[in-house]
Amino acid sequence: MLLKVLPVGLLSVNCSIVVDEESGEALVVDPGADPQRIIKELEPFELVGIIATHGHIDHVGQVKTLKEHFNAPFYMHPADKFLLSNPLWPGFERQIGANFPCPDPDVELKDGMEIRLGKSKLKVIHTPGHTPGLCCLYSEEDKTLIAGDLLFKGGVGRWDLPGGSREDLRRSLKRIFSELEDDVLVITGHYEETTIGQERLFNPYLRSLFV
């Protein structure tokens, strides 16, 4: 499995392009901005799905553009549908250049679901807290977690936006840190990648959440 991470937009959302090199099939995760750049990266491949880890506008801002260009299905957890027409703050959609509102998902993500990409597969892990429907995508073969805004290097997702829950976030983080090994690479929703082990040792927010 080939993974390319493109930081896009004003908020540096990590848009992940996942490719099965043998079949040439590709998935794109969290296409929040910079649609022409994303399209250029995807053109050599067959795009078979557009996935949002959650429904915040900075992560779904160009889903509509990619659906129209590639005619590929959109995957998201149904609990976040209410966010697809919510800019979070007045005028935020214009500030970040979103193609808004985002369409409803064609395929609903569910915990434990496997998304196949040629011979590769991504497991869906439902991890609410930042939003009710946030889902991580895990490649067991490559020991890589696409975490959306669940976890950051030195931080965790905020829980004070619509649908957020501190208690759900606590449970989701406990699940991730109990199920995954320390050498798992974490592609965060914004900024630098990290590992489960590094965050287990050094993330101050985890200590406060687990008290």
Show the residue positions of the predicted features.
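Conserved beta-strand hairpin/beta-sheet module of binuclear metal-dependent hydrolase folds
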Residues: 1-45, 136-148
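Short Gly/Pro-enriched turn/cap motifs at secondary-structure boundaries
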Residues: 6-8, 104-106, 126-128
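Conserved S/T- and glycine-rich ATP-binding loop of Class I adenylate-forming
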Residues: 18, 53, 127
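Short, glycine/acidic-enriched loop or turn micro-motifs at the edges of active sites
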Residues: 22-23, 33, 57, 80, ...
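Residue-level marker for buried hydrophobic side chains located in beta-strands
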Residues: 27, 51, 74, 146, ...
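Active-site HxH/HxHxD metal-binding segment of metal-dependent hydrolases
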Residues: 33-116, 120, 201-205, 209
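Metallo-beta-lactamase
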Residues: 92, 121-210
